């Protein structure tokens, strides 16, 4: 315990400062170092507290499901919500930082401050005195009867004992919303309260393991294993083939792939109602889901979003349950970002703050055809190798359980990734301090193509390319395997596509179920669901299209695409082929500008 020196001098000389016994001057107080032989300047109002670095607020959110694993969705002083890199946290007044539960923000928001007994000055005491919540929060009962913390002052506790709403708002548990006179917004989920005076061994302040960023978010993983919905919602398949979120648990997904109904009700699409034995309710509209993007460790294994890839003692990849984590030297444990591993105490340390470290779990094989993170859409890739092969480029690949590495010659080689080997310069692979034998040579994707592709007795193209006849005679090499040569003699398309010379694109035709549909005559008599104009109507789930006579016609697809010939239409997500008789999926379109141009062939020896 530090002893403060010169309090009487402090009162009399705030401007001049404090002169310590060793003649140095301190602005507030002098504190003797261990042993008492020397002194250091200190501030008793700050130095007797545990401090930790605050976190930066991230992207906007509506619920914890919008944030990476281990993050929380906190309400800011501006009334908005943002992701904080702590599982339970509060936003700082500066609007840019946040602190973990059990801490206060410093004035500038850059530091999180905690008293040694973890009993916060200004913390909200729950009835009974056994539990407390952070300042500017509200105590609410949880499902198990214990106390939880709503991260808003004077909040309204919802009857389900799971959610809460801001002061003055009412809970709409049917639609999972907080309703005010100005509008509505999603319900907030309560957090468990913390026991008062919680301390670790020898009085060392710690953070409860339940409050670590390793805590899983409250979310529902959809059947495709890559989309997720907020807690207390239901995944429903949309017409696009992706998953949407119905805003209630155990909901009924309607057959139109657009609406949903509460549990124990039936969808009545004709009347747009949810029917039950007692009463009918209006159909609910589904909301988009959020996609979970895996963290790739290498070409074969990955970790869930919000986790970090770390090497295990076996050399294989493991997953640390923190984002941007610190991998400990024992290859078994890991710590949150900003902490260091203390192997003797089995803890993670940041200044005076200590938290238990986490144990890594083995990484999982990457899911096939995993989508890329959001970004500008590029052209679909040409057909690749079988999923069991590890593709190095369009021509060569490695066997399963390997990674592609460049040899000294510039050619491809293979290292055994299943044993944790990494690529090294030259002819070797390495894992830790252990070298592997020489790299194995990669093999061609098609083992039968061991020589150039012969166009005729005079010309040939490299392996993995296709011979195409030129318009003026002779041959050109299409830089795609098994390609389709276009009739203009200048372009080519990947296998499975057809050439649309007029549109300068490669198109993949839809199956028979997506042939363009002829337009039907609209009705002028009865009152139907979709109004076209000029007193013309189409049935519900149909689309109004102009016909060739300038009048209205009905497309049998919901949100259909009207073809330019004014006689046909296509489903949503497709576009009409130039002649209007077929529908082409938008994702099955390759513009010629995005494809390699045919090159000159090689003379045969």
UniProtKB/Swiss-Prot annotation:
Quaternary organization: Progranulin is secreted as a homodimer. Interacts with SLPI; interaction protects progranulin from proteolysis. Interacts (via region corresponding to granulin-7 peptide) with CTSD; stabilizes CTSD and increases its proteolytic activity. Interacts (via region corresponding to granulin-7 peptide) with SORT1; this interaction mediates endocytosis and lysosome delivery of progranulin; interaction occurs at the neuronal cell surface in a stressed nervous system. Interacts with PSAP; facilitates lysosomal delivery of progranulin from the extracellular space and the biosynthetic pathway.
Superkingdom: Eukaryota
Protein family: Belongs to the granulin family.
Main localization, broad class: secreted
Keywords assigned: Cytokine, Disulfide bond, Glycoprotein, Lysosome, Repeat, Secreted, Signal
Glycosylation sites: 197
PTM entry text: Cleaved by ELANE; proteolysis is blocked by SLPI and is concentration- and time-dependent and induces CXCL8/IL-8 production; granulin-3 and granulin-4 are resistant to ELANE. Cleaved by CTSL in lysosome thus regulating the maturation and turnover of progranulin within the lysosome.
Annotated protein name in UniProt: Progranulin
Region (Disordered): 359-386
Alphabetized GO MF terms: cytokine activity; protein-folding chaperone binding
Gene this protein is translated from: GRN
A GO CC term attached to the entry: Golgi apparatus
